């Protein structure tokens, strides 16, 4: 008899927040979603939840990976005074001691100067690299300010490719 193999269904209201359903999804791998008229309107599985988490988390993780790559490029190449020169004007109370104290825009300000770029010893086009960094900065601002539209495919793809590019530079010993 099929009834003997059944287990109780795990049901949540369609109005319940996804966050509150996480525990049930985690424990049982799914929840059934119940409409106000008590009909079952759908199912949310652990796989659905994992994919949604990946979509939301991936941009943050990629931006972090890219920032770490840029910091690695800049590490030990500049004095604290030179790093402070990249600071946004009027931000005098902030002290910059290492590349990790710079904002993303300040990375761009620092390396767009030819004299600073030369110190990095990267055999790639400065304007192209700075342009890509600037695009990362723009995407980063959308990501960090929780753009309700999320990240479009082109921006996600760009972040993945740029993170991979920095990884290749590291793998070949360029940084």
Language model region names:
Residues 1-10, 45-48:
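Bateman (tandem CBS) regulatory domains
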Residues 15-35, 39-138, 142-175:
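Amphipathic alpha-helical interface elements
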């Amino acid at each position: 008899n099929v009834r003997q193999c059944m287990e109780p269904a795990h049901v949540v209201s369609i109005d319940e927040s996804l966050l509150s359903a996480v525990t049930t999804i985690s424990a049982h791998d799914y929840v059934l979603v119940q409409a106000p008229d008590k009909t079952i309107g759908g199912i949310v599985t652990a796989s659905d939840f994992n994919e949604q988490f990946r979509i939301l988390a991936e941009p943050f993780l990629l931006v972090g990976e890219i920032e770490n790559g840029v910091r690695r490029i800049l590490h030990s190449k500049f004095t604290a005074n030179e790093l402070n020169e990249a600071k946004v004007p009027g931000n005098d109370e902030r002290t910059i001691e290492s590349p990790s104290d710079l904002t993303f825009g300040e990375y761009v300000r620092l390396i767009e100067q030819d004299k600073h770029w030369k110190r990095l010893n990267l055999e790639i086009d400065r304007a192209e690299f700075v342009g890509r960094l600037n695009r990362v900065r723009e995407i980063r601002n959308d990501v960090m300010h929780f753009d309700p539209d999320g990240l479009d495919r082109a921006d996600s793809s760009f972040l993945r490719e740029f993170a991979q590019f920095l990884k290749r530079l590291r793998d070949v010993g360029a940084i």
